[in-house]
Amino acid sequence: MAPNIRKSHPLLKMINNSLIDLPTPSNISAWWNFGSLLAVCLITQILTGLLLAMHYTADTTLAFSSVAHTCRNVQYGWLIRNLHANGASFFFICIFLHIGRGLYYGSYLYKETWNTGVILLLTLMATAFVGYVLPWGQMSFWGATVITNLFSAIPYIGQTLVEWAWGGFSVDNPTLTRFFALHFLLPFVIAGITIIHLTFLHESGSNNPLGISSNSDKIPFHPYYSIKDILGLALMFIPFLTLTLFSPNFLGDPENFSPANPLVTPPHIKPEWYFLFAYAILRSIPNKLGGVLALAASVLILLLIPFLHKSKQRTMTFRPLSQTLFWLLVANLLILTWIGSQPVEHPFIIIGQMASLSYFSILLILFPMIGTLENKILNY
């Protein structure tokens, strides 16, 4: 029998073992589609970003004009820019759902996979932040000023660190240049960490909705899950293209249509929608260093999740109390997102503080408590 090149070629066999002959649990649901959707988002963002970079000028006097030029004069430039801007939103929608799936089904017990995933989230957030500065509109400039300024809360080295990051005494041309360099570099770093993420995942194999071993019943990834992923892809691309083609500026801030002006502060400085939950937590603490620590903790808390798992069952499939708590957490995050978009005044301040407190309470105190309680109820 002739050797199958797919299984013998040094490069093709790696692809084969990851995407074709990969043994996959037979019962994973549509919630397992988001990994491949994230890969597609990354590829889309790199391609559109590369095309945009060909027409972009990283200079404070030209950046805003170069983006306007791309939209007006470059063939399909408007489309490339809108795909890239809204592609970021869909990237975050997918990653939030992917993390939510991991929380619900106990996927975080694969610690290496989970930790590399958290690193991917942090890198994605950094990439999105530096990218938002590049069009050099009002919200770009003031967003960069406010967020980089947070580093000055670090004791002793803070101010030096901020001026070093800025390349001067304020957000200016050096800042824009280095942010462009970082925004170009980081997606490739994300691609590299993604490969590490997958390597760790394929060491153990995928989890499944029941949280039990799948070893007795595995099926090849292709054609079963390749076709399922393509369906998921189509279902994601329909709303993505609808948003991009019908209301491309729906998620953007009107302030960003004005060129950056250091002398005029916008009435409400706020980040893109996908950072609002963390921004609300930052603002809920009336102390600069405390706010920065809470902001960092709001994402880094994910690293603690594997250690807070007290249940004898892996997933929440058969744990109604934990399920209730999980959806409470989701509602809580939606409230935080809403609060982050509101001005700092009554009643939003107290709502934000309550939501921030309950966010940390649910994750750090209530989840382990309910897990232990469920064990007792089930006589474990």
Curated annotation (Swiss-Prot):
Gene3D superfamilies: Cytochrome Bc1 Complex, Chain C (1.20.810.10). It comes from the Eukaryota. The chain crosses the membrane at residues 34-54, 78-99, 114-134, 179-199, 227-247, 289-309, 321-341, 348-368. GO terms for molecular function: metal ion binding; ubiquinol-cytochrome-c reductase activity. Heme b b566 binds at residues 98, 197. Heme b b562 binds at residues 84, 183. Binds 2 heme b groups non-covalently. InterPro entries: Cyt_b/b6_C, Cyt_b/b6_C_sf, Cyt_b/b6_N, Cytb/b6-like_sf, Cytochrome_b, Cytochrome_b_C_euk/bac, Cytochrome_b_N_euk/bac, Di-haem_cyt_TM. One of its GO terms (cellular component) is respiratory chain complex III. CDD domains: cytochrome_b_C, Cytochrome_b_N. Keywords: Electron transport, Heme, Iron, Membrane, Metal-binding, Mitochondrion, Mitochondrion inner membrane, Respiratory chain, Transmembrane, Transmembrane helix, Transport, Ubiquinone. It holds the Pfam family Cytochrom_B_C. A ubiquinone binds at residue 202. It is a multi-pass membrane protein. Its cofactor is heme b. GO terms for biological process: mitochondrial electron transport, ubiquinol to cytochrome c. Heme 1 (or BL or b562) is low-potential and absorbs at about 562 nm, and heme 2 (or BH or b566) is high-potential and absorbs at about 566 nm. The cytochrome bc1 complex contains 11 subunits: 3 respiratory subunits (MT-CYB, CYC1 and UQCRFS1), 2 core proteins (UQCRC1 and UQCRC2) and 6 low-molecular weight proteins (UQCRH/QCR6, UQCRB/QCR7, UQCRQ/QCR8, UQCR10/QCR9, UQCR11/QCR10 and a cleavage product of UQCRFS1). This cytochrome bc1 complex then forms a dimer. Belongs to the cytochrome b family. Component of the ubiquinol-cytochrome c reductase complex (complex III or cytochrome b-c1 complex) that is part of the mitochondrial respiratory chain. The b-c1 complex mediates electron transfer from ubiquinol to cytochrome c. Contributes to the generation of a proton gradient across the mitochondrial membrane that is then used for ATP synthesis. This is Cytochrome b. It comes from Alectoris graeca.
